[in-house]
């Protein structure tokens, strides 16, 4: 019988992901002067580094095949009941939040809210989150989230060290902090020369070398400890106290700020966010007024717009890495906005009474469990607890009991090194679960009666008294509140977001769906590996695929942001040099680099030396050679972005690598611009030694309004032994550095999105995506050239996947880059990246997901704005009262009874037919950032502000 060839389904995902249709591709190629996509990419990418073979990846799956495959893999994971605790808990995500936030592109596709006028919805949501954290922690200032609890603790240590100007060297960590937190803090401390003393903090010797103390409250084994005396002793020697804590517990126990903590931090995961095998979850960080201008991460604050109305925006940005660079307080860039929003909405949904009721429910179950365990003859270590018990089993080893619980009941418990067993309860636990737990210990539910209570540490202060947390008790009201906030924000559901260096591509629905599969979402990160076989297959194959795409020999998925990828990559370089017996600590960084580069280098214990950039935007090769020669004995690394931050494939990239290698250093490549490389060239082939990959850029994880992100690193073979390890789950190389994230695989849950993207695009689709990204950028540059000056192009006259418009000449007419950015809002667009990497410019990156019609719509808007600028230049428009200076215009302003401007309402609010038909109106006028920084308000304002 004749064998039939396999038939591919005609509906290919790549055709859905890529914006332009074939006829549009041909038209754009003709406009830029190339006959084919291959001819275009051959001209853009230096010949010496081009990949001359297809990527060795599996053939593309259809969306249906992808979903079936991942559902099958999710079912290979065992959905056991995990009572392990250690900062990860079962939780109930309210369906109204799951459907309308987590699964809603109106919430997950935006970028960080740099354009506040079209981001008031998520800014309010983040202010809610900050208010929750501030109220529960009893501290006046909270940020808009950090990456995870471990890194938040490390940030607290760095904050305290900075307060002492680096003159103190000892940081005490209480031995009953979560082990992963201890390990992350130790890793952060070592390059900074800080000695970490892990001990019983209340018995530690405190002297004038003390930076501060970190405690867990309640402790990792569940005890509620009164740390007031410790705080007094620490403050007496001018040290500081950080408390890693639990938001749900804080509804019942005294706020850390009340007993003297200077910082309270932790994970908000149990406020509705699935465990997801470790992340992503929003960490929180609250502190005193003293540290308001040094706190790491983003802060949302209240200001006013040009009409004097209340308006929200990101506050105190001048302290951040993109401005302060190596002097920044932190390298934190992306945070966990989507997860912070979910946690904040969870608090809004339940309100203070509902949260307290949940906490009392959990604590009541725990008290009953403790009574039942004691009745069965077991020793429960502590009398004061919230949700976690430490048990010394009677008549059986802890190891045997834990194994039996897994085998007979699919129950996961924590095993301590001394044989004790840990049990942590949560809001998902039922009486049936309690009965099963007691059965494991040989107890009986009928004997599990006790009177719960927080004892001496019972909370005495109110929280969440703002009306927002009591106004939306019905689902109808909650739904409408979520929708009202969503409608204030521009997302990819409305228009392209052409932010340069941000790669705002499609986040396809099929890629997102597996995130909520129970077999993936419900897994505890410290569950036995035998229960995570589906995850192990996904994570293992993703590492292999990323290695093939980049040309590297090994990959670590642990870093949970691009900035942490930078930090991790530099730590592996540092560890390699140390293993060779070399004392190398100089990191060369071009002056055009993103601010996270120098900030990460300093965190990794390196000294930053700047390298000049020439007039064409390329690294000055002569200056690189001079700096490499000057610092050769101490040269650790060069950090380079490729294509460059100016959007150019530099032809000398291999020569740069040779210069550094010849001087004994290694080359770190910032992978922010990898979207122009996939399938066309591979960093590992042209001399790069380590590179981080922004999975939230190139590989389709959504930006979430400012997180989550994921920044895995790829390394050459000699660096593989130093990939980061973990104290609980074996990961990393033979000589692994310490962990850089709390969970062994970082934000494992969202790695599914990148796995799905690669699996559905296949090798041909991935290459075509890079080619169309380059085509779209060059087509737009061609259309705008002549209206604006396009800075920096390669030898062939082409940009890579992004390009820079010079708008500095318009300053003579009183028009700034900000004016153009705000005027674009009136046309229905989010602005490009503003004043980076060159002040007074706009950097545009369209990505491969936008079709020609949208590119033309944006170009038409930019050309129309150029005409408006010309009217000012020619005196045809008022120098002060003009559409640019007053942009953006709100619907309330345009429809008001009074109109006093020198231009018509139609020009203000309806500059094009498309803008008249559909756009996101700004809900506030231009925000006064300076006013907000002078008058810092970072929690929910009075209700009048929402009017």
Give residue ranges: language-model regions:
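Core active-site phosphate/anionic-ligand binding loop and the adjoining beta-turn-alpha structural block
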Residues: 270-271, 280-350, 638, 696-769, ...
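N-terminal export/assembly segments and adjacent metallocofactor-ligating motifs
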Residues: 112-122, 128-130, 143-147
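Conserved PLP-enzyme active-site core in the AAT-like
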Residues: 121, 151-311, 373, 377, ...
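Non-catalytic terminal extensions of PLP-dependent enzymes
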Residues: 2-31, 43-83, 92-108, 114-117, ...
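General small-molecule cofactor/ligand-binding pocket signal
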Residues: 142, 195-199, 381, 414, ...
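Conserved phosphate/anionic-ligand binding catalytic regions in large, soluble enzymes, centered on
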Residues: 273-286, 290-291, 335-339, 424, ...
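A conserved hydrophobic secondary-structure block that centers on an alpha-helix together
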Residues: 132-150, 167, 171
